[in-house]
């Protein structure tokens, strides 16, 4: 019943455009002679002598599904309505009303199959104001009338009269199908159409009736011209016959011969089968006399025996060179005893006089005394001679010798066995069929064998149930064991309950199937997961272990962030160390060069950046400029213009001085060693560079780096 109510409520919510029928309630007459409510109070005014109670009556209608005990409470599963004030104490309900929102009869549209039963509640209520039509106040109730009925679909109105303690209500009702809906429950939809998708009208029960010239399930197949070849012809509209390629004719039953074929025929398109007496590719060559002149008559066969000669093979009953003479089989008078002979083609027939019979009337006739009638036939003498037999039912023939076989026309359908009776026949139907000729398939689904919401599919002498989830068996009566396939993991125990399963997890696991490893749980706590939520025998933990998952994600993020910070720190340290090494190496190189040259010349220059250089194309007094600049650095300034004057023998002196300088100021030993090896191994490169610098008219200045010697042009800033 609960499922029925849910289905009904859903159907009531469907748009009115999808209705299949309408329940109509027509209010006709209401009597409330005293003008009182249900609690015997006067609606309005005073019940004192000489005064009349006056009510303003309106109605509340509630249409429900069939209930053994009708309840007036909501919901009104089939629909509800509240009328405006229709009258006073006693009145007849008009069919029209100024308020266009109310019509009489009152319609209740259905969007589903009419079940055939209903429950109806009609409440008459009083109001002080026509604008106040609330129905919650029980003091307004004048009367309540309830009924439940069976109702078939039809145009005829059913009358009813409800009599209460002080009131009477006369009304009528019916259920009619919407347009294009048919059947007992208005569940058959059929809309006539005459377009590409069908050409049909609808019968009284909603069956499709094809228009003239159309056939098929939905009348979409045109009926071609009668006689149109089914294989070689077709049609797009009724009454026509279009030929397929290779065929022609009114009925498309003539094949098209090979182009140019003159005296030939075809069995298939594009053939040229020569007629007798003709040959060649196009059957245009005359081969014999028989073909030219056709001398043989009366259907005889002509055979060429040479040029200008032939032989005719005559059909029975004919003779002569050209079979032109018909043979008379009666010429020998074969009929005896006065029988009359009739010449036929290659035979004859004798018409015997009374009292004789046989092919040549050679046999004398029998009488009833000879008992000529068989199978219980009644013999009667013929006044003109001879006899005749009156055959019983089921027999025929001159002597009732033939038994009439009523099964000879194969009247039984669907491989049923036909039994020939005396004057009729009987069809023994195979399983699954019924009817006089076994033409009707028995609907095994008519008894609704499928249980628990299963869908029934009718077959031949059988049916098939498509079960909903959770049920199995021939009739869907067996519930499926949810624990059959061991859905629970990690040693959990499966319990079946309420058409579902519940997993009792061992400590440390969770999830519907105990598939998740959880953070450590309190001692002895077992977790159970069901179809709807996860349970714990001691405390509900809220379902999926989000805390554990979130904690794991946060931990991973912290590790990644810490690792990134550590990598960045290491890279910065390595970069600072590399810069310090490069700086120490450059300073050491400049100091070494300064020490070597300061012993010969006491000169100093300012070291300037490449971006600050200004070329003035003249020689510069580095000694005076150095004094002017007045740099007081821990490193002696170098006159790079004098570097090219260094001799090869000065290199050894430079090495010894560098070792002494190292004692005073520690440098990176690796950078020092690289520079010493570079000076010793690249002497040839240095000589080439010195030569290049000598030729530079701007008195170029260069520094010997770790990688290679370069010329740097120094100019005044």
Swiss-Prot record:
Matching entries from Pfam families are given as: DSL (PF01414), EGF (PF00008), EGF_DL_JAG (PF21700), hEGF (PF12661), MNNL (PF07657)
Native organism: Danio rerio (Zebrafish)
Tell me the protein's name: Delta-like protein D
* PTM comment: Ubiquitinated by mib, leading to its endocytosis and subsequent degradation.
Q: In which tissues is it expressed?
A: Expressed in both mesodermal and neuroectodermal regions. In the developing nervous system, it is expressed in overlapping regions with deltaB (dlb) and deltaA (dla); in the neural plate, dld is expressed in patches of contiguous cells with dla, while dlb is confined to scattered cells within those patches that will differentiate as neurons. In somites, it marks the anterior part of each formed somite, while deltaC (dlc) marks the posterior part. In 24 hours embryos, expressed in the hindbrain in stripes adjacent to rhombomere boundaries, but not in the actual boundary cells.
Q: Sorted alphabetically, which keywords does the UniProt record give?
A: Calcium, Developmental protein, Differentiation, Disulfide bond, EGF-like domain, Glycoprotein, Membrane, Neurogenesis, Notch signaling pathway, Repeat, Signal, Transmembrane, Transmembrane helix, Ubl conjugation
Q: Is Manganese given among the entry's keywords? A: no
* PANTHER family in UniProt: CYTOCHROME C OXIDASE POLYPEPTIDE VIC-2 (PTHR12916), UNINFLATABLE, ISOFORM C (PTHR12916:SF4)
Q: What's the encoding gene here?
A: dld
């Amino acid at each position: 019943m609960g499922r029925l109510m849910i289905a009904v409520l859903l159907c009531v919510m469907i748009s009115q455009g999808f209705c299949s029928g309408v329940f109509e309630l027509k209010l006709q007459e209401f009597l409330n002679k005293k003008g009182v409510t249900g609690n015997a109070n006067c609606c309005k005014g005073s019940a004192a002598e000489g005064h009349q109670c006056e009510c303003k009556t309106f109605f509340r209608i509630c249409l429900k599904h069939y209930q053994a005990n009708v309840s007036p409470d909501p919901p009104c599963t089939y629909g509800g309505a509240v009328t405006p004030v229709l009258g006073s104490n006693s009145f007849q309900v008009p069919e029209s009303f100024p308020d266009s929102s109310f019509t009489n009869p009152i319609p209740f549209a259905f969007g589903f199959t009419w079940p055939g039963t209903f429950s109806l509640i009609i409440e008459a209520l009083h109001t002080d104001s026509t604008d106040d039509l609330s129905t919650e106040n029980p003091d307004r109730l004048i009367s309540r009338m309830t009924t439940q009925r069976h109702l078939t679909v039809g145009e005829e109105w059913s009358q009813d009269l409800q009599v209460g303690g002080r009131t009477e209500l006369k009304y009528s009702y019916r259920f009619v199908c919407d347009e294009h809906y048919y059947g007992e429950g208005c569940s058959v939809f059929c809309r006539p159409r005459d377009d590409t998708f069908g050409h049909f009208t609808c019968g009284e029960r909603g069956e499709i009736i094809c228009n003239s010239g159309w056939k098929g399930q939905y009348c979409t197949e045109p009926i071609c011209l009668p006689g149109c070849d089914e294989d070689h012809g077709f049609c797009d509209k009724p009454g026509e016959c279009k030929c397929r390629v290779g065929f022609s004719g009114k009925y498309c039953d003539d094949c098209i011969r090979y182009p140019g074929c003159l005296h030939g025929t075809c069995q298939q398109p594009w053939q040229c089968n020569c007629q007798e007496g003709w040959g060649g590719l196009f059957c245009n060559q005359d081969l014999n006399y028989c073909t030219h002149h056709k001398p043989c008559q009366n259907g005889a066969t002509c055979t060429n025996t040479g040029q200008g000669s032939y032989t005719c093979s005559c059909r029975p009953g004919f003779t002569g060179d050209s079979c032109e003479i018909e043979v008379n089989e009666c010429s020998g008078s074969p009929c005896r005893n006065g029988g009359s002979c009739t010449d036929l083609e290659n035979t004859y027939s004798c018409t015997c006089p009374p009292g004789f019979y046989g092919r040549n009337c050679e046999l004398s006739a029998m009488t009833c005394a000879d008992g000529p009638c068989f199978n219980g036939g009644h013999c009667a003498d013929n006044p003109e001679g001879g006899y005749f037999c009156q055959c019983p039912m089921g027999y025929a023939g001159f002597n009732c010798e033939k038994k009439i076989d009523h099964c000879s026309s194969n009247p039984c359908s669907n491989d049923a066995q036909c039994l020939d009776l005396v004057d009729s026949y009987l069809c023994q139907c195979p399983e699954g069929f019924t009817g006089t000729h076994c033409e009707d398939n028995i609907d095994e689904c008519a008894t609704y064998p499928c249980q628990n919401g299963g869908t029934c599919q009718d077959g031949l002498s059988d049916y098939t149930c498509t079960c909903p989830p959770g049920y199995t068996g021939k009739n869907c009566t067996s519930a499926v064991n949810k624990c059959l396939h061991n859905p629970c993991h990690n040693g959990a125990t499966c319990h079946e309950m309420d058409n579902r399963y519940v997993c009792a997890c061992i400590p440390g696991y969770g999830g519907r199937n105990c598939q998740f490893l959880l953070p450590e749980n309190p001692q002895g706590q077992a977790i159970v997961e069901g179809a709807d939520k996860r349970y714990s025998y001691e405390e509900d933990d809220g379902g999926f272990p989000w805390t554990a998952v979130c904690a794991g994600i946060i931990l991973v993020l912290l590790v990644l962030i810490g690792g990134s910070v550590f990598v960045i720190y290491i890279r910065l340290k390595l970069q600072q160390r590399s810069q310090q090494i490069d700086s120490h190496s450059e300073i050491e190189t400049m100091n070494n060069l300064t020490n070597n040259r300061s012993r010969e010349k006491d000169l100093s220059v300012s070291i300037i950046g490449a971006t600050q250089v200004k070329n003035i194309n003249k020689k510069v007094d580095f000694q005076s400029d150095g004094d002017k600049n007045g740099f007081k650095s821990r490193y002696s300034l170098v006159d790079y213009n004098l570097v090219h004057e260094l001799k090869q023998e000065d290199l050894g002196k430079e090495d010894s001085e560098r070792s002494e300088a190292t004692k005073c100021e520690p440098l990176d030993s690796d950078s020092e060693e690289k520079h010493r090896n570079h000076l010793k191994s690249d002497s040839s490169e240095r000589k080439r560079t010195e030569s290049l610098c000598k030729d530079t008219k701007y008195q170029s200045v260069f520094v010997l780096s770790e990688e290679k010697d370069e010329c740097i042009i120094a100019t005044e800033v």
